Amino acid sequence: MFDWQRFFPFQQFSKDGLKNADPKDVEQYIHHMMKSVFGPGYAVQFPFRDPLSKETSAADESDPIDIFETTSHVFVKIPLTKEQLNLLKIKHTSQTLIIENYPEKGRQEKVVLPSLVRRKGTKAIFKDGILEVMFLKNEDFNLSEIDITF
């Protein structure tokens, strides 16, 4: 009888091969792959993260920028000194806030917003050492009907 198993290289991925796999090893492998594809601060790019995860990214620890949203607005709070405020320039696209000369001169910080925002109507107020940027959400009510074929 011919030994077919010798020519079947995928046996390592069979159910028996995965029975002894440690879930933590699998999770570490996935984190390693995600970091290699999306970069070290990849976790902030995804809206649904594990709240019980003990691993915090370097961006979360060093980033004092606070982002939250309401039904009609997106708010970004940035702690600043008056000296930083004089050098600061802020711009935005429909999904990203770009802060120039922050946290130090010559650097640029990009903040991904949790939802799309309008081009006009953005306001920025500096009070008590905090710059608060308020965006109007872009409400997209465009519906498209999809034909079902069968």
Curated annotation (Swiss-Prot):
SUPFAM superfamilies: HSP20-like chaperones
Domain of life: Bacteria
Record keywords: Germination
Chief location bin: other
Disulfide bonds: none
Annotated compartments: Spore coat
Record bears the keyword Cell division: no
Functional summary from the UniProt entry: Involved in spore germination.
UniProt protein name: Spore germination protein GerT
Organism: Bacillus licheniformis (strain ATCC 14580 / DSM 13 / JCM 2505 / CCUG 7422 / NBRC 12200 / NCIMB 9375 / NCTC 10341 / NRRL NRS-1264 / Gibson 46)
Gene that this sequence comes from: gerT
